[in-house]
């Protein structure tokens, strides 16, 4: 049994193998899954309350050579009041990103691998916007935190409620701002771009390695370059690095489980779509050319942002090198 804490796996305990079937069955009962079905993957959820904290547990089971595996993802509903500063955004990146989310229309992308904090950043961005003066709507899978004053919709594959179908319905709900949990296909990308061109501010996540590759990823999906160049406001790429333990500052102690780290913060790379970059996108420039143009316009790479954290004594060089590339 292993826990992923601050992005790294730790073995916690090795239960007796004889307990395996009973543990899996109990989890499946709690998650309202079919305990007799052992041949197919299943997904479910468990809602728990620990004191005043509401915990949502996402359960995924998968058959394997040695029996079923189960992975549990914990979502603490009480941690919804996040700010951009709390996720680690500072200085010029914060100022420029706030400028992007204050625009009346266009699309902003937040990109990175799974577990890099993209959705948390989107929630923090929505928290900056006035939900009383704007009709803010989201489509997510799953809804990770409940936001007051925001209309949140969760996709449901069992009834064929996809991102694209939910987005079409949301556009009939008079939204000002739309948040899309993830752009997974051309249909979703197309609706998102069209929404941003018709007077809506759209915020969405995408799975790419850096800011420049988000542009080529969308064009590879089939989005027309002239539409993307007209609608894209900017791309924020990010990773999470572990922070030094405040008690031992990296040497390892009982407070951090001898790892030297507790908690995480973000390193960011913000590409703002200037006229020069719009021209590059329109002309179907390569990823390298778009990155070069962005650097000329003042974009700082994630590794450079990480250097700031190293200099401030927040994290180690090894951590920054672990999650970023040249």
Predicted regions and their residues:
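Short, flexible helix-loop junctions that flank or precede catalytic/ligand sites
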Residues: 1-326
């Amino acid at each position: 049994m292993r826990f992923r804490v601050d992005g790294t796996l730790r073995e916690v305990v090795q239960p007796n193998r004889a307990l395996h079937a009973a543990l899996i069955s109990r989890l499946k009962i709690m998650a309202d899954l079919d305990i007799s079905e052992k041949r197919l993957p299943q997904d479910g959820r468990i809602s728990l309350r620990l004191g005043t904290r509401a915990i949502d547990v996402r359960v995924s089971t998968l058959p394997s050579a040695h029996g079923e595996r189960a992975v549990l993802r914990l979502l603490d509903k009480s941690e919804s009041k996040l700010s951009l500063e709390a996720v680690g955004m500072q200085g010029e990146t914060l100022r420029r990103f706030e400028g992007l989310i204050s625009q009346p229309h266009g699309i902003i992308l937040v990109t990175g691998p799974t577990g890099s904090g993209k959705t948390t950043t989107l929630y923090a961005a929505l928290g900056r916007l006035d939900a009383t003066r704007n009709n803010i709507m989201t489509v997510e899978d799953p809804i990770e935190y409940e936001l007051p004053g925001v209309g949140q919709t969760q996709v449901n594959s069992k009834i064929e409620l996809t991102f694209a179908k939910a987005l079409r319905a949301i556009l009939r709900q008079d939204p000002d701002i739309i948040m899309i949990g993830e752009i997974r296909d051309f249909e979703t990308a197309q609706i998102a771009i069209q929404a941003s061109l018709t007077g809506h501010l759209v915020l969405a996540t995408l799975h790419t390695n850096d800011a420049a590759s988000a542009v080529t990823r969308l064009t590879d999906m089939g989005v027309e370059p002239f539409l993307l160049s007209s609608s894209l406001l900017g791309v924020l790429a990010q990773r999470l690095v572990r922070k030094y333990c405040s008690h031992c500052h990296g040497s390892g102690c009982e407070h951090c489980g001898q790892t030297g780290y507790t908690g995480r913060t973000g390193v960011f790379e913000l590409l703002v779509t200037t006229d020069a970059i719009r021209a590059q996108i329109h002309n179907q420039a390569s990823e390298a050319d778009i990155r070069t143009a962005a650097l000329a316009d003042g974009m700082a790479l994630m590794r450079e942002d990480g250097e700031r954290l190293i200099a401030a004594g927040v994290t180690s060089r090894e951590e920054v090198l672990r999650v970023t590339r040249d």
